[in-house]
C-alpha cells in the first residue's frame, strides 16, 4: 500500500515537471542563482559533496509561490555554478512528518546519502505553538531516490518543548554529533532560544549531551532571541564556529535590521564543551540573507549558501509562479576573529565579454555606461586617500525613468550604502556596512535579474563584508553610472563582465 507521503511526492513531482518552461518568460528569473522550477523556496538543506557531485536540497512548496507544507527540493552540480533540478527528495504526509519535512542536513554514511530532517506535526490550528517536532531520517544509495526511515530523535532536551528543529550532524572520531535548535517557554517573553548537543554511534540512537549554548547564557544577544534556527557547528582556521539564525532580536543602530538574523559566535571546542569567545556577529548586511548552511567542497574549502530572501519582504515574482532563490556559493575564511566571505572562484566560468577602464576621476560629475545584459559581474577599486567626495559610487539597473539601485560610499557616515528605494517593484529600504579603514576599497558585485550581491574588501583582504539584497527592476533597466557628489572621486579600476546564463531551469536527465 502506498504511503500518504509517496502520493504527495508524485503530486509534487508532477507540479515541478509541468512548470519548468513557463519560467523562461519570467523577467526576474535568475540566471545563476539556484531557484525553484515552480512554487516556493526557502532554507537550503543537506548541502554535501557526494560521489563526485554537489547536492543542494531546500525547503520547497511546489504547488504555489507561498509557504506551505514543506517538501525537500533537490538540485545537483559538478562545478557549483551549473545546477540541475532533480526529483523532489522528500514529501510530507507520514505520521512523523504529516505537516512538513522541515530543515536538516545530509551526511555520507559509508556511501549511503543520509538525510536528517525535522518532522513537523500541527496539533491544533489555534496556536503556532501547538506543534510537535521530531528528528527523522531518510536514506538513498543513488543520491536521488530516498527511503524514509522514520523518527531517530523524539524527545527534546526538556519536557513541553514544542519548537525543536533543524538538525545538523557531523562525525568526529568515532562518534556522530548533532546540534539542533529548540525553544523553552518564558512567561515574560515569547520564549528563549537554545542549541542542544546530542551524540550517537549509529545515526539512529541519540543521547542528549547538554545544551551547547542558549540565550540565557552570558551572551550579548539582548537575551530575547526566542528561537535559534538552523544551527551549524564547524571548525574554521583555529577556531570553532557556532552559526545560527536567531529570531526575536531587536534592531539596534545598524544591527539586526531584518526581521530575523543570521550570524555566528566563535569559540573553543573540547568535546562536549563549547566556550564562546566572541559576541554574536551577523554574516551579511543586506535585506535578504537567512538560514545559511555550510559544507566542505571536494578540495577542503568551506562553502556557504543562504536563502536569498527574508520572511517579511515583498516577493514580486509570485505573479510568475515562483518565489525565493539561493545566494551565490561563498568561500569562508577566518581573518582576525571574523568570518570573511568571497564568491567561489568557479563563478569565473560564466564570464564572457570584458570591459576595463583603468582610472576614472570625477568631480561633481557622472560617468555613464550601458550593460549588455542584466547578468553582470563588476570589480571596482575606489581610492579613499585621493578622494574627498561626500558620496561616491555607482547607480545600477537604471532605466532613465527614475529606476535605479544605488551603491555608494558615504564619508559622513563612514559606511557603504545600498539604497534600493527605486530598485523596481515592491522593494524599498537601505542597508549598509562599515567602510573599511584602508586607503583603497574594493567592491566585487554580482547582478542577476532580481538580485545584487556585494563583497567589500580593503587593500589586503577581499570579502570583509557582504551586502545581499533582492531587486526587481524592469528588464530594460540596463544603464549605469559612476558618480561623485560634493567633491572628487578617483576610481583606480573599473572592470565589468557580462555573465553567461547558467540555464538553471534545466531538468536533470537523471530524473527520468
UniProtKB/Swiss-Prot annotation:
Record: residues binding substrate: 40-43, 59, 67, 102-103, 165-166, 229, 311
Swiss-Prot/TrEMBL keywords: Carbohydrate metabolism, Cytoplasm, Glycosidase, Hydrolase
SUPFAM superfamilies: Arabinanase/levansucrase/invertase, Concanavalin A-like lectins/glucanases
Pfam family, one: Glyco_hydro_32C
Gene Ontology MF annotations: beta-fructofuranosidase activity
Pathway listed: Glycan biosynthesis; sucrose metabolism
Catalytic activity, EC: 3.2.1.26
InterPro entries: ConA-like_dom_sf, GH32_Enzymes, Glyco_hydro_32, Glyco_hydro_32_AS, Glyco_hydro_32_C, Glyco_hydro_32_N, Glyco_hydro_beta-prop_sf, Suc6P_hydrolase
Localization per Swiss-Prot or TrEMBL: Cytoplasm
Reaction equations catalysed: Hydrolysis of terminal non-reducing beta-D-fructofuranoside residues in beta-D-fructofuranosides
Superkingdom of source: Bacteria
Active site per UniProt: 43
GO-annotated cellular components: cytoplasm
GO biological process, one term: sucrose metabolic process
Homology family: Belongs to the glycosyl hydrolase 32 family.
PANTHER family in alphabetical order: BETA-FRUCTOSIDASE (PTHR43101:SF1)
Protein's UniProt name: Sucrose-6-phosphate hydrolase
Organism for this UniProt entry: Zymomonas mobilis subsp. mobilis (strain ATCC 10988 / DSM 424 / LMG 404 / NCIMB 8938 / NRRL B-806 / ZM1)
Gene from which the chain derives: sacA
Amino acid at each position: 500500500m502506498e504511503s500518504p507521503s509517496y502520493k504527495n511526492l508524485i503530486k509534487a513531482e508532477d507540479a515541478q515537471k509541468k512548470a519548468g518552461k513557463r519560467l523562461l518568460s519570467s523577467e526576474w528569473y535568475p540566471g545563476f542563482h539556484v531557484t525553484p522550477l515552480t512554487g516556493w523556496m526557502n532554507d537550503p538543506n543537506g548541502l554535501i559533496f557526494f560521489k563526485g557531485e554537489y547536492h543542494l536540497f531546500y525547503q520547497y512548496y511546489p504547488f504555489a509561490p507561498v509557504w506551505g507544507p514543506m517538501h525537500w527540493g533537490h538540485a545537483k552540480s559538478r562545478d557549483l555554478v551549473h545546477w540541475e533540478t532533480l526529483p523532489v527528495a522528500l514529501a510530507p504526509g507520514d505520521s512523523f512528518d504529516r505537516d512538513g519535512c522541515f530543515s536538516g542536513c545530509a551526511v555520507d554514511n559509508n556511501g549511503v546519502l543520509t538525510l536528517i530532517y525535522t518532522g513537523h506535526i500541527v496539533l491544533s490550528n489555534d496556536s503556532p505553538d501547538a506543534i510537535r517536532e521530531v528528528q527523522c531520517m531518510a536514506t538513498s544509495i543513488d543520491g536521488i531516490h530516498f527511503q524514509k526511515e522514520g523518527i531517530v530523535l523524539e524527545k527534546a532536551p526538556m519536557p513541553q518543548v514544542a519548537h525543536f528543529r533543524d538538525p545538523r550532524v557531523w562525525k568526529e572520531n568515532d562518534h556522530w554529533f548533532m546540534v539542533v535548535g529548540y525553544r523553552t517557554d518564558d512567561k515574560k517573553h515569547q520564549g528563549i532560544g537554545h542549541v542542544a548537543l546530542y551524540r550517537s554511534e549509529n545515526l539512529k540512537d541519540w543521547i542528549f549531551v547538554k545544551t551547547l549554548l542558549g540565550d540565557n547564557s552570558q551572551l550579548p544577544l539582548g537575551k530575547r532571541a526566542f528561537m535559534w534556527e538552523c544551527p551549524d557547528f564547524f571548525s574554521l582556521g583555529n577556531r570553532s564556529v557556532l552559526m545560527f539564525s536567531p529570531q526575536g532580536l531587536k534592531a539596534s543602530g545598524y544591527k539586526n535590521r531584518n526581521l530575523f538574523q543570521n550570524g555566528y559566535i566563535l569559540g573553543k571546542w573540547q568535546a562536549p564543551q563549547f566556550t564562546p569567545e566572541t559576541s554574536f556577529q551577523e554574516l551579511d548586511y543586506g535585506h535578504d540573507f537567512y538560514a545559511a548552511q555550510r559544507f566542505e567542497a571536494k578540495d577542503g574549502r568551506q562553502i556557504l549558501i543562504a536563502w536569498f530572501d527574508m520572511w517579511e519582504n515583498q516577493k514580486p515574482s509570485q505573479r510568475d509562479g515562483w518565489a525565493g532563490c539561493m545566494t551565490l556559493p561563498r568561500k569562508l575564511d577566518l581573518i582576525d576573529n571574523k568570518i570573511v566571505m568571497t564568491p567561489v572562484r568557479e563563478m569565473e566560468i560564466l564570464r564572457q565579454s570584458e570591459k576595463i577602464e583603468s582610472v576614472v576621476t570625477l568631480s561633481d560629475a557622472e560617468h555613464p555606461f550601458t550593460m549588455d545584459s542584466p547578468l553582470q559581474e563588476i570589480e571596482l577599486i575606489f581610492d579613499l586617500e585621493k578622494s574627498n567626495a561626500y558620496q561616491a559610487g555607482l547607480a545600477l539597473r537604471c532605466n532613465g525613468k527614475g529606476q535605479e539601485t544605488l551603491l555608494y560610499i558615504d564619508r559622513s557616515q563612514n559606511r557603504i550604502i545600498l539604497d534600493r528605494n527605486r530598485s523596481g517593484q515592491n522593494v524599498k529600504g537601505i542597508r549598509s556596512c562599515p567602510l573599511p579603514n584602508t586607503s583603497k576599497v574594493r567592491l566585487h558585485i554580482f547582478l542577476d535579474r532580481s538580485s545584487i550581491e556585494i563583497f567589500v574588501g580593503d587593500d589586503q583582504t577581499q570579502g570583509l563584508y557582504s551586502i545581499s539584497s533582492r531587486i526587481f527592476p524592469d528588464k530594460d533597466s540596463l544603464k549605469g553610472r559612476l558618480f561623485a557628489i560634493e567633491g572628487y572621486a578617483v576610481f583606480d579600476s573599473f572592470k565589468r563582465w557580462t555573465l553567461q546564463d547558467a540555464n538553471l531551469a534545466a531538468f536533470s536527465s537523471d530524473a527520468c
